Design a protein with these regions (language model features):
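Loop/turn elements at helix/coil->beta-strand transitions in domains of secreted/extracellular proteins
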Residues: 132-137, 154-159, 217-219, 240-244, ...
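Bacterial signal peptide processing site
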Residues: 19-21
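Alpha/beta-hydrolase-fold serine-hydrolase catalytic core, especially in secreted/extracellular enzymes
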Residues: 23-122, 127-132, 305-309, 314-404
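Mobile cap/lid helix-loop segments that gate and shape the active-site cleft of serine hydrolases
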Residues: 211, 248-300, 321-329, 335-342
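Primarily recognizes the serine-hydrolase "nucleophile elbow" in alpha/beta-hydrolase
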Residues: 202-266, 278, 289
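Bacterial N-terminal signal peptides that target proteins for export
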Residues: 1-8
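Cap/lid segment of the alpha/beta-hydrolase catalytic domain
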Residues: 139-214, 218, 251-260
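C-terminal motif of bacterial Sec signal peptides marking the signal peptidase cleavage site
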Residues: 14-17
Length: 404
């Protein structure tokens, strides 16, 4: 049968609709999951015991599960709500008209207004030679965090130093922190809600000043190590404008799964963490009650999906519980794998080096993620899952929901 020319455009449209949807690597909104209905938050005794790692694809109300990417935003909404309620407290929501920003030479200055009070933030930017715009790495404390600067400087990547103390101190005293001045009714929140709020305000500032920043906002990364590695993880999890998160040696409360850590030795468990970083009420889930926590930190890591995440570990420090990091990273990566984008999540765990001192053997892995996700080089291989010392660990027993 001969096709008329009128039918050809229709056929083209039909064929296009059959093509798989391209999964974004970054978004232009802080949180695309902010418009879903609030879910119920049962008390401790009403929560079911879940001995293994909770299914990241299961609905919170027990009505089933979905592994469709189109449903992932709703899953993110539910996980974030549970994370806020049971672990870190709500990250304050800010309207754009309450923020002012300007460039002061190579320093971005941001002012946030709320309730008649103001909070001032500043971020020094280390620029490469040239006019830009440049991809950029937000580093906790330093322009590139604890990662070697030459990895970024040799690639003409800017570094943005995030001064977290302008938001909240390392061991907060509730009610006396800078953020408490503009949110006096939210003094219960943990630092891992407050610090990511500050990172998001720096990104807001970059958006407000626009081309003056000389920063490519489609290619922003964040990194930090140890407690700052957790900070980077939570920041990447809670702001979808961050294209690449590198969590270096984050330890307990970071990528490590609380449930797995509870089975190990002298490590940072839920009952032995720093509660200035979390809600004080999270302590109710310590020890034998950890199985009642409705989420775990493989889901916190998975909040970064479908964007890029690289997790770095260091087995020389028992407290970091890198076996837990390994199991949780495996479980989190299952989310990326389910969506057919497992190359966007990797992990590398290695010993024989100082804390927060990246060994040369891990340079290529960091460079690969930087090249692919900050410099747009899709040909770079980022299928990195290196933790040879844990090759005999039965991680699958922790994730019965995963595809065998």
């Amino acid at each position: 049968m001969k096709l008329s020319t009128l039918s050809l455009p229709l056929i083209a449209i039909m064929l296009a609709s059959c093509q798989p949807k391209e999964i974004p690597t970054v978004y232009d909104r802080e949180n695309t999951a902010d418009n879903y209905t609030a879910i119920e938050m049962p008390g401790l005794q009403q929560l079911p015991e879940i001995a293994t790692l909770p299914d990241p694809f299961a609905w919170a109300d027990g009505s089933g599960r979905s592994t469709r990417f189109d449903d992932w935003a709703r899953h993110r909404s539910e996980i974030i709500q549970q994370l806020y309620h049971y672990e870190i407290g709500e990250k304050p929501v800010v309207s754009r008209d309450s923020i002012e920003a300007f460039m002061d030479n190579d320093t971005l200055r941001v002012t946030v207004h709320n309730g008649g009070e103001t909070l001032n933030l500043s971020a020094t930017i280390k620029y490469p030679e040239g006019d830009g715009p440049f991809p950029a790495m937000i580093g906790v404390g330093f322009p590139y965090g604890s990662l070697p600067p030459q990895i970024f400087e040799s690639r003409n990547i800017a570094g943005i130093a995030f001064n977290f103390t302008q938001v909240m101190s390392h061991t907060q005293k509730r009610g006396t922190e800078p953020i408490n001045r503009i949110y006096p009714d939210m003094i219960q929140i943990g630092a891992y809600s407050a610090w990511p709020w500050g990172v998001s305000r720096i990104i807001d500032g970059l958006e407000i000043v626009g081309e003056q920043s000389r920063i490519d906002l489609k290619h922003l990364g964040i990194t930090g190590c140890s407690f700052a590695g957790k900070m980077a993880l939570f920041s990447g999890a809670l702001d979808e404008r961050i294209a690449l998160t590198i969590a270096q040696e984050p330890g307990g409360g970071g990528v490590d799964a609380w449930r797995v850590s509870e089975t190990l030795g002298n490590v940072e468990t839920l009952g032995r963490t720093n509660y200035s970083w979390f809600l004080e009420s999270m302590a109710q889930f310590a020890e034998e009650n950890v199985s009642r926590l409705p989420i775990d930190h493989h889901q916190v890591a998975a909040l970064i999906a479908p964007r890029a995440l690289l997790v770095l570990g260091n087995t020389d420090f028992e407290w970091l519980a890198d076996e837990s990091n390994y199991v949780s990273s495996r479980a989190a990566r299952e989310v990326w794998r389910t969506f057919g984008i497992e190359e966007r999540m990797g992990f590398s765990i290695e010993g024989n080096h100082g804390h927060c001192q990246l060994p040369e053997s891990q340079y290529p892995e960091v460079e690969a993620f930087v090249d692919r996700f900050l410099l747009d080089k899709p040909e770079i291989d980022t299928n990195i899952t290196r933790a040879d010392m844990f090759s005999e660990v039965d991680y699958m027993k922790w994730m019965p929901w995963a595809e065998k």
